[in-house]
Every structure is written in structure tokens, then in C-alpha cells.
């Protein structure tokens, strides 16, 4: 089988899709022809993978980038049997008007809500956003979301909440719930005088890292506990979190250590 995967991020970028897509691609490429199209901070002449990686530079004119991505999907999708959409959903929809290929789409949230919420253009939570009416521009984005989603042949979600979300949008195709997996490691008993916490996450508003910091600040003040929190990741909330850490007087307790990969990340566990 010939498979094309589209994603918004891929190593060396850090984030959920950048972890999931290579794992899936590594497995599928053993028995199938496979290519990946991704946005990237930089383009690389050589990628150390057993399948094709086609990178489009993220930081460029958005209209030009969109058109370039659509054309690349059309070019690389002509001979594929199926397109797995882990990102670039609107670009795939436009390209597939010409390609007419079967598609499987992974839904892990509402991309329209996430974008608006991350940019502080709305304050409503996920479920409120589905019920309320907004400006014409936002309603148009929701319409495009719904229309493109319903064009998929199969949708995969990691939770019942998201399954209900997809059903409520009127999707009539094949819908599968596959819960997120995790790496099982050997547990070790330790006796420590202090509490150590770890957050591994993209630094975006919807992750609610600010609530964790405020909660730990209250616990520290009430119970006088000593703790250390390492936050691994990068993203647009970095400066806001730095300011909050200073405001809550947690400079000695909380460290933003940036993005870490593989062995570097294991060190924090």
C-alpha cells in the first residue's frame, strides 16, 4: 500500500504529533511505501528516516505556504492509496478535491477553538465554544472545520468526549476510538525529603500550566512544603509563564528547561 501522512510538526520539532507520527510511520514503512509532508522551522537536505520526508518552511507568507502545501500534497498524493491526516487538514481537503483519495483523519481537539483560544481571541472553554455563536469570521472557520471533517472516510479519536464532539458535528463515516498509549517503565521506590514534579508539554494556553503554578503556590504557602517543578517544552506561553513564576515567587521552585529530546528527556524522569 502507498500511504501519505500530513502533519503540522515533525522532529526535530517537539510536541504530541512530533512523537506520534514518527512512531506510526516507522511501523507502517516496514511493509508499505510511505511519505510524510510536514511544516518545519528549517528544511533539511537529508533526513535520517526510512521513508520520504517533505518539509515546507513554516515561517513564510501564509498564503504562499498554503498554496505550496496544497501543490505538494497533490504532487505526492497522485499514486497513494490513502492519506492519513494528522495535520494540515484544510490543505488536504483542497488537494483532495483533485486527488479523490480515501482519507483517515486523527482528531485530538478542535483546531479552530485551539487557535482562537491560544491567541486570546476567546475565553470560552471547548464545550462552550461549540454551543455559542460568534463573529462571521469565526462562524466561517467553524463551517470550514465541519465541512472538511465530514469529508473524511474514517476519523480516529482518543476519547469518548471527542467521539461525541465529532458525532455532534454530523459526521456519518467510520469513527474509531483509540486511547492514547504510554511507555511503561519500571517503577522505583525512592525516599526523598522534597517533592519533585514534572510537566512535559507544549507551552500553550489550553494546557492550563498557569493553574498548576497557582495551585502549587497555594500549597507551598499553606503547608510550607519544599518542591521542585521542571517544565519541559516550548511554545507561545513561555514569556507569560516566566512572568507568572516571578509573580508567585516560585523562581527557586520552578524551572522552564526548554525542549528536550529522547535521552535528554529521560533524565528528567
Give the location of each predicted region.
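Conserved donor-binding/catalytic core segment of Leloir-type glycosyltransferases
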Residues: 4, 156, 189-207, 212-218, ...
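Membrane-proximal helix-turn-helix segments that form the acceptor-binding/catalytic region
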Residues: 70-78, 127-155
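Short alpha-helical donor nucleotide-sugar binding micro-motif in glycosyltransferases
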Residues: 77, 149, 259-260, 267-269
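Short His-centered aromatic/hydrophobic patch
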Residues: 85-91, 107
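Acceptor-binding helix/loop patch of EC 2.4 sugar-transfer enzymes
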Residues: 104-143
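Carbohydrate-associated surface elements
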Residues: 161, 181
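Nucleotide-activated donor-binding/catalytic signature segment of Leloir-type glycosyltransferases, i.e.
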Residues: 240-260
